[in-house]
Amino acid sequence: VDVKTLAPKLRHNMPDWLAQPLQEQLGEESFRALATSMNVAAPLDLRVNVFKAKREAVQLALAQAGIDAKPTPYSPWGLRVEGKPALQKLDVFLKGEVEVQDEGSQLLALLTGASRGQMVVDFCAGAGGKTLALGAMMRSTGRLYAFDVSGHRLDALKPRLARSGLSNVYPVQIAHERDD
């Protein structure tokens, strides 16, 4: 099938109500680049738990396990992995030295500037990816509250928190953003 002959919503894998305003705003060439990028699988990024390990050591351990990992372009904690390896079986994962986390989320944590001894609140903690990054930045000191309305998502944080080695994280389920 020649992709160029398909209807726009099929060609770009995007509904017309979204494609039309984007195309008008971006122009044809930029829109095509955006649509193409949205139809490609995202890379697999890892965040090294700097409370427990160094990026170079984790990269070496991954290489010894036959996994090609390169430093991410922007995050000083990140490694970009080729393919989709079974990370949950690796020693670096089991020991909490590495977590799956996209580079954008790593950068958000970095931008907070959280540091030792502070009190920090993550109001939409979910399963805790950014919470764990913040805790490592704080070197497991101070108090880090992980708030979320979903107890189920906070439950997913517990095994990750145990692996991380952090002791300054306090998960709290709240009713809503104005919870007393």
Regions found by a protein language model. Name each.
Residues 1-180:
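S-adenosylmethionine
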